[in-house]
């Protein structure tokens, strides 16, 4: 049984989610203790509990310690199975953080998987669903994955209630991806959406983003606005995407009470501008989230990023505990090169259990 100290590195929920995902994929039992020990509210929150339950359902796992505020769980995976699953978070907890754990496992199931997830689609301290759909998923698609996400209803803090349907086809091992050279910018797209808020807010958010990008020598910026998204409660978000030949860079911001709409749009614009100017092939958030997929590929992958977050460093450590993969991180001028090298032949004997 793997023993994982949940306080290691960044010591947050991502370590827990990735631990149970890797346990399910590899068939290794795991005990995770000191869960979220570095947070002001340690232990399992509802969204963490739902993520673990989602992975447990996909592999018929036997579990212990599965309750809110629990700081230790034991996860004993069984056989991976496809089918249709319902994963209600019950709060405004993030849908994308549940997907962060469940999607890699669904790819390994050997059968089609449909996941009906309810919760928060656009909440702070988590990737907005549109970032997951339009920045991260295209990268995973390029590695051979096939998944489709449909938003039936958006959900915001504090009410949640968003509804998302995710269809996944099995496809492990993934193809490696080489994003090891800076590329020219082909264009910038994006969109802003709001629900149950005055229309002027959406235009102020869009104008804030455009103002940040207007002095940047890029191709034309195509920004769409949507003011009638079906949702539970009030909220909104902006997503900006820079398109390169083989990769995308993303930046986003989620509306919050008391923060001017222009400032939120400008925040996303500044972040995207910084990513573009750095010459990175993946933005700092994609660099964090793509690591598990690189570890499940059939060959060497690499990318360039402007910063390696504590989440990413912790995930690299964790992946090397579960999988025969080695990561190499090197500083190259103002960029960081990350290289993932799986050290097994084709994954078949290891993953298809």
Swiss-Prot record:
It is found in: Cytoplasm. Its EC number is 6.5.1.4. One of its GO terms (cellular component) is cytoplasm. ATP binds at residues 100, 285-289. Belongs to the RNA 3'-terminal cyclase family. Type 1 subfamily. Catalyzes the conversion of 3'-phosphate to a 2',3'-cyclic phosphodiester at the end of RNA. The mechanism of action of the enzyme occurs in 3 steps: (A) adenylation of the enzyme by ATP; (B) transfer of adenylate to an RNA-N3'P to produce RNA-N3'PP5'A; (C) and attack of the adjacent 2'-hydroxyl on the 3'-phosphorus in the diester linkage to produce the cyclic end product. The biological role of this enzyme is unknown but it is likely to function in some aspects of cellular RNA processing. This is RNA 3'-terminal phosphate cyclase. It comes from Nitrosospira multiformis (strain ATCC 25196 / NCIMB 11849 / C 71). The gene is rtcA.
């Amino acid at each position: 049984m793997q023993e994982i100290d949940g306080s290691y590195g960044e010591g947050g929920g991502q370590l827990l989610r990735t631990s149970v995902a890797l346990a399910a994929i590899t068939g290794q039992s795991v005990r995770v203790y000191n869960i979220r020990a570095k947070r002001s509210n340690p232990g399992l929150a509802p969204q963490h509990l739902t993520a673990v339950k989602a992975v447990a359902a996909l592999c018929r796992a036997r579990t212990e310690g599965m309750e809110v505020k629990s700081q230790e769980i034991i996860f004993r995976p069984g056989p991976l199975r496809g089918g249709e699953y319902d994963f209600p978070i019950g709060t405004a907890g993030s849908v994308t953080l549940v997907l962060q754990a469940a999607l890699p496992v669904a790819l390994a199931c050997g059968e089609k998987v449909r996941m009906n997830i309810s919760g928060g689609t656009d909440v702070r301290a988590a990737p907005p669903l549109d970032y997951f759909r339009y920045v991260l998923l295209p990268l995973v698609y390029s590695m051979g994955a096939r998944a489709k996400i449909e938003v039936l209803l958006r959900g915001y803090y504090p009410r949640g209630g968003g509804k998302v349907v995710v269809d996944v086809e099995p496809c492990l091992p993934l193809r490696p991806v080489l994003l090891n050279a800076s590329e020219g910018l082909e264009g910038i797209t994006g969109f802003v959406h709001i629900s149950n808020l005055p229309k002027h807010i959406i235009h102020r958010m869009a104008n804030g983003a455009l103002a940040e990008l207007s002095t940047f020598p890029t191709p034309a910026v195509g920004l769409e606005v949507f003011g009638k998204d079906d949702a539970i409660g009030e909220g909104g978000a902006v997503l900006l995407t820079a398109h390169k030949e083989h990769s995308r860079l993303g930046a986003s911001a989620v509306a919050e009470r008391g923060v001017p709409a222009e400032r939120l749009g400008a925040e996303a614009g500044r972040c995207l501008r910084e990513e573009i100017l750095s010459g990175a092939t993946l933005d700092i958030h994609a660099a964090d989230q793509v690591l598990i997929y690189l570890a499940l590929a059939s060959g060497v992958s690499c990318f360039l990023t402007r910063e390696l977050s504590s989440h990413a460093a912790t995930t690299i450590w964790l992946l090397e505990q579960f999988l025969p993969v080695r990561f190499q991180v090197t500083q190259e001028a103002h960029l960081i090169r990350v290289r993932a090298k799986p050290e097994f032949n084709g994954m078949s004997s290891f993953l298809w259990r």
